[in-house]
């Protein structure tokens, strides 16, 4: 067969997202870390207000309306923001702008596996450094590696732990390359590294509206960084990467902080209760600062439980990766969804 693809693409494995059942399928979906509550009513109203004139014209290329709204919420100038088709696109833009064969991308493991996929697309070198015991960041090893790009997810997935800002500040001050702090789950955490962006030119902070704002289907994320760093990223950004609908709705959603905070508070309360319930079943549950829990079943039968729950139309996440084979990641759902999950697990463990 004709070989159409670059050798690095032939060799790489595709990123595998959580299963997305067809719309209308009756399932308890706790596998993709989606927010169980609907988007802001104000955002939904903005969606209804969009008319054909918005769709006839090309969108504003830099997502200006969203940048202005996010600027006011975050307290940073709008020219410190780059907007993307989900935060994954911002990650991709960084990789495209900063790496090539012979340049190294570094990150601790386990973490978001898309970092590996994006790096392989560019045929850049990869160095994966294991987390130390109790999810302690291997700061010295990351500094010694000095990648062209270093990814740190905080809160991390699938573990849910947060990386101390002191560790991130140490990395930012010592690394010569770009430090990407992926804060996709920060809305459910107690602290952020946002201040580091204004202290260090080599830091870009990545956020999304998929989690805290319930807009995973809309696809909008953004990066916060020094304009000197963003200038290089804009060079490789697609010309019209943010559609007009996403920009408009996301601008309204990020402005409605009261609604977002109310949903986040409910998720955090449910996270606490679900942690307690799973521990009563004998699970080990790691402390989480995200909208999910990393758990270890009492009998080490993670894959079995994953498959049996799937038969009952309850979807959670099982990773066939080193160090995760005996663990399950569970998205925090509504209290009702969590009760159904716990009841099913209790029956399976009898």
Curated annotation (Swiss-Prot):
Q: In which pathway does it act?
A: Amino-acid biosynthesis; L-histidine biosynthesis; L-histidine from 5-phospho-alpha-D-ribose 1-diphosphate: step 7/9
What superkingdom heads the lineage? Bacteria
- Please name one Pfam family that this protein belongs to: Aminotran_1_2
Q: Name one GO biological process term.
A: L-histidine biosynthetic process
N6-(pyridoxal phosphate)lysine: residues carrying this PTM: 211
Known partners and oligomeric status: Homodimer.
Q: What is this protein called?
A: Histidinol-phosphate aminotransferase 1
Q: What is the lineage of its organism?
A: Bacteria, Bacillati, Cyanobacteriota, Cyanophyceae, Nostocales
Instruction: Name the gene for this chain.
Output: hisC1
């Amino acid at each position: 067969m004709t070989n159409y693809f670059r050798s690095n693409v032939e060799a790489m494995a595709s990123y595998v997202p959580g299963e997305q059942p067809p719309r209308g399928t009756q399932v308890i979906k706790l596998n993709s870390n989606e927010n169980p509550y609907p988007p802001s009513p104000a955002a939904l109203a903005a969606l209804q207000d969009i008319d054909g004139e918005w769709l006839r014209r090309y969108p504003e290329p830099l997502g200006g309306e969203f940048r202005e709204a996010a600027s006011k919420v975050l307290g940073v100038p709008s020219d410190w923001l780059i907007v993307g088709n989900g935060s994954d696109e911002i990650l991709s833009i960084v990789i495209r702008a900063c790496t090539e064969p012979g340049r190294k991308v570094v990150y601790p493991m386990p973490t978001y596996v898309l970092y590996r996929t994006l790096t392989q697309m560019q045929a850049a070198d990869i160095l994966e450094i294991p987390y130390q015991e109790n999810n302690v960041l291997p700061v010295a090893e990351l500094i010694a590696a000095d990648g062209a790009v270093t990814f740190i997810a905080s809160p991390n997935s699938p573990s849910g732990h947060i990386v101390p800002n002191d560790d991130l500040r140490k990395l930012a001050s010592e690394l010569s390359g770009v430090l990407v702090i992926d804060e996709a789950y920060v809305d459910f955490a107690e602290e952020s590294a946002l201040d580091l962006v204004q202290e260090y030119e080599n830091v870009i902070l990545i956020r999304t509206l998929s989690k805290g704002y319930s807009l995973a289907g809309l696809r909008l994320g953004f990066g916060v960084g020094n304009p000197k760093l963003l200038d290089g990223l804009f060079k490789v950004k697609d010309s019209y990467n943010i559609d007009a609908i996403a920009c408009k709705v996301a601008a309204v959603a990020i402005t409605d902080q009261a609604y977002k905070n109310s949903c986040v508070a409910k998720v955090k309360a449910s996270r606490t209760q679900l942690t307690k319930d799973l521990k009563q079943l004998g699970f080990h549950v790691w402390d989480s600062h995200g909208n999910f829990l990393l758990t270890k079943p009492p009998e080490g039968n993670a894959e079995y439980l994953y498959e049996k729950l799937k038969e009952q139309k309850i979807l959670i996440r099982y990773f066939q990766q080193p160090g995760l084979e005996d663990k399950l990641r569970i998205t925090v759902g509504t209290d009702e969804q969590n009760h159904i999950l716990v009841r099913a697990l209790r029956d399976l463990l009898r």
